[in-house]
């Protein structure tokens, strides 16, 4: 229902807007500041603004509506529409006012919520067909086996051994026994899905009654288990295979035979084996491993080549002083490798000639 609301100036007005033609939604008040002028004018969240100071909001964007509200200085006239009647009382809580909604509609309640069959008072039970040994409780008709209305049921004497028979004949009917100074109510239907053994429940009930009467409880003998030497037991155990020996691989068996067939006079112990680099003769056309010109072993990795001869980097030394000739000049004299000083000493020119060292061009 459209309503006209006037808020006295100046700003702030105390409410928040949302929507606009740019959002394809009407201008709606989303929040009211407690204690503000909007709350005093009884504005509520959810009110749709139809006009601001006489200007319709059908074609207003959100920014235009904010500008129109900011332009109002002395008072702000709003035309609002409320879909339903809202009660917005100013309730003060700890000095702050908070508008709230009140739903006056009563919620339906199930009248049968508190009526459940398990909440009824247990009724006493008597063994049908038994006429002696136990007296008949008040409120029980022995001839028909049906219970009659009675406020209090009492039992003068009770036979604990007959409880199992009574409970098994009517497992869903509660048993109520009033003994001197104690009252025992047994409702077997409270055990969900028969999770507990019926025999255990009966033994417990019989023990309680016997203890209350001052008698020694007589427990039934446990059911004998299946003998372990039955036909099925023997059939299952006779078909089992004997434990087989662990399986060994073919290589292990060959080594085991060699060890068993070997002579016993060989000395026992360990020996140190030093790995030796072997030169494998490759097939024709395959690249062979280079041999060191000094030590004669194969070269794996870095190699130094001088005049078609290969050496290890640590073997590339002078034959006299063992000076490493890497990054230095080297000389071959009679097939041996020397440094410059020892090469001059071993090479003496004829008389009248001087020794001149010639270095290859880079």
From Swiss-Prot:
Molecular function terms, GO-annotated: actin binding; actinin binding; cytoskeletal protein binding; metal ion binding; muscle alpha-actinin binding; structural constituent of muscle
Coiled-coil segments: none
Residues annotated as domain LIM zinc-binding: 290-349
Localization (cell): Cytoplasm, Myofibril, Sarcomere, Z line
Phosphoserine carried by residues: 18, 92, 263
Gene Ontology terms: biological process: actin cytoskeleton organization; actin filament organization; heart development; muscle structure development
Keywords attached to this entry: Cytoplasm, LIM domain, Metal-binding, Phosphoprotein, Zinc
Tissue specificity statement from the Swiss-Prot or TrEMBL entry: Highly expressed in skeletal muscle and at low levels in the heart.
UniProt keyword Metal-binding, yes or no: yes
Residue ranges occupied by any PDZ domain in the UniProt entry: 1-84
Name of the protein this chain belongs to: PDZ and LIM domain protein 3
Biological source species: Rattus norvegicus
């Amino acid at each position: 229902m459209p309503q006209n609301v006037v808020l006295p100036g100046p700003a702030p007005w105390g409410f928040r807007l949302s929507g606009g033609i740019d959002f394809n939604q009407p201008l709606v008040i989303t929040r009211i500041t407690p204690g503000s002028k909007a709350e005093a004018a009884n504005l509520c969240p959810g009110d749709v603004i139809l006009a601001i100071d006489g200007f319709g909001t059908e074609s207003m964007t959100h920014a235009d509506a904010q500008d129109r509200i900011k332009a109002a200085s002395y008072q702000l006239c709003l035309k609002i529409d409320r879909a339903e009647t809202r009660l917005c009382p100013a309730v003060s809580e700890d000095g702050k006012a908070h508008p709230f909604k009140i739903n006056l509609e009563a919620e339906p309640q199930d009248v049968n919520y508190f009526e459940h069959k398990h909440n009824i008072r247990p009724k006493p039970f008597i063994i049908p067909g038994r006429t002696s040994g136990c007296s008949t409780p008040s409120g029980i008709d022995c001839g028909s086996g049906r219970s009659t209305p009675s406020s209090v049921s009492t039992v003068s004497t009770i036979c604990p051994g007959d409880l199992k028979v009574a409970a098994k004949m009517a497992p869903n009917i509660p048993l109520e026994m009033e003994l001197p100074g104690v009252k025992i109510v047994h409702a077997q239907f409270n055990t969900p899905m028969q999770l507990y053994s019926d025999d255990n429940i009966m033994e417990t009930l019989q023990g309680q009654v016997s203890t209350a009467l001052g008698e020694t409880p007589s427990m039934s003998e446990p059911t004998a288990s299946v003998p372990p030497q039955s036909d099925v037991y023997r059939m299952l155990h006779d078909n089992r295979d004997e434990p087989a020996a662990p399986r060994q691989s073919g290589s292990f068996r060959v080594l085991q035979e060699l060890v068993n067939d070997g002579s016993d006079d060989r000395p026992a112990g360990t020996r140190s084996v030093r790995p030796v680099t072997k030169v494998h003769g490759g097939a024709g056309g395959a690249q062979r491993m280079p041999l060191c010109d000094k030590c004669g072993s194969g070269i794996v990795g870095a190699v130094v080549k001088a005049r078609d001869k290969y050496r290890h980097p640590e073997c590339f030394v002078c034959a006299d002083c063992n000076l490493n000739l890497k990054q230095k000049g080297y000389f071959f004299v009679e097939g041996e490798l020397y440094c410059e000083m020892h090469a001059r000493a071993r090479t003496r020119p004829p008389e009248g000639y001087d020794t001149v060292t010639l270095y290859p061009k880079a």
